[in-house]
């Protein structure tokens, strides 16, 4: 039988002390040992936001070079994605993290692409994830999209509850790393009718209510207008941390082919600058179907036109 927690006296609870630095991303966006869930329709640009968070964590710099968010210190990040593959992942990292010094941030950013056997409803799939984490020893793992990491019924509270329990066990096994998870999940198809809907509501998550009841923080996204020159689009977002104050809605500007600034804050959230700032990346292969390290460093000093 696993070790069970016992009830605490309130006096003992009140006397407990907690570390000051309890979050990988502030303000209260990604708790150490917690879970952040992204949500939105396909092709909105969620992956660009996730990669920017990975960049910021692995380099210890502000996400989006924005005054809204901060990273108290560097964290080792493992990105596991099921859709792009290594060729497209290389292209995205290369575009996002131009002008690299390959040795600048070695051992802080890793990628693992297209591992269909990593199915968390099976013991073999769980072991695959465990082994990948054990190989890298990351502080943060990104699973994108979570729907391709399991064979559970996404509409079942029981089965999705089981999925989150399995993820909690994984985090518990690496508690010495303060392991946190960032997951991406899809929204259900928008309803058709005369009434205007809240496109950023967490109730838009497809499937079981466990998707939006269980994580520590929810981040929802909706694609806005495309730029006139077709070079990018606006991306509305809402960040809902359970451990802190909800931010004002934030709109990002996504420019996938812009080598100087792929993602930046356009408006909202109380941002004081919204410019692009320092970033970097390069990649060297480690071993077949084990995560490989991604290193980066570059200068970005460009404001939105």
Model region roles, listed by residue range:
Residues 37-38, 43, 47-48, 77, ...:
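Phosphate-binding/switch region of NTP-binding enzymes
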Residues 71-158, 165:
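Conserved inter-motif catalytic segment of the P-loop NTP-binding fold
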Residues 59, 134, 172-176:
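Residue-level signal for alpha-helix termini/capping positions
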Residues 2-98, 103:
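The Walker A/P-loop phosphate-binding site
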Residues 16-23, 123-124, 199-203:
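Short gly/ser/thr-rich secondary-structure transition/capping motifs
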Residues 242-305:
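Conserved alpha/beta core segments of nucleic-acid transaction machinery
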């Amino acid at each position: 039988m696993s070790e069970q927690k016992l009830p605490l006296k309130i006096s003992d609870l009140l006397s407990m002390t907690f570390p000051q630095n309890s979050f990988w991303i502030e303000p209260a966006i990604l708790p150490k040992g917690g879970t952040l869930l992204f949500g939105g329709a396909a092709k909105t640009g969620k992956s660009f936001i996730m990669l920017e968070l990975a960049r910021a964590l692995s380099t210890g710099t502000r996400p989006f070079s924005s005054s809204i968010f901060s990273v108290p210190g560097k964290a080792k990040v493992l990105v596991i994605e099921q859709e792009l593959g290594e060729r497209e992942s290389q292209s995205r990292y290369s575009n996002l993290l131009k002008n690299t010094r390959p040795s600048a941030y070695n051992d802080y950013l890793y990628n693992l692409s297209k591992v269909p056997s990593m199915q968390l409803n099976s013991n073999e799939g769980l072991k695959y994830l465990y082994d990948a984490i054990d190989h890298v020893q990351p502080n943060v793992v990104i699973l994108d999209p979570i729907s391709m990491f399991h064979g559970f019924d996404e509409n079942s509270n029981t089965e999705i509850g089981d999925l989150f329990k399995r993820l909690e066990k994984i985090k518990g096994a690496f508690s010495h790393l303060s392991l946190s998870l960032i997951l991406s999940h899809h929204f259900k198809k928008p309803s058709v009718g005369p009434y205007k809907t809240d496109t950023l509501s967490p109730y838009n998550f497809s499937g079981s209510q466990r998707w939006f009841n269980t994580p520590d923080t929810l981040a929802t996204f909706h694609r806005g207008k495309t730029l006139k020159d077709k070079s990018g689009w606006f991306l509305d977002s809402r960040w809902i941390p359970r451990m802190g104050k909800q931010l004002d809605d934030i709109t990002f500007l996504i420019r996938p082919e812009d080598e100087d600034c792929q993602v930046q804050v356009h408006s909202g959230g109380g941002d004081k600058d919204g410019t692009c700032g320092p970033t970097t990346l390069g990649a060297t292969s480690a071993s077949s179907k084990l995560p490989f390290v991604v290193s980066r460093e570059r200068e970005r000093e460009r404001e939105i036109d």
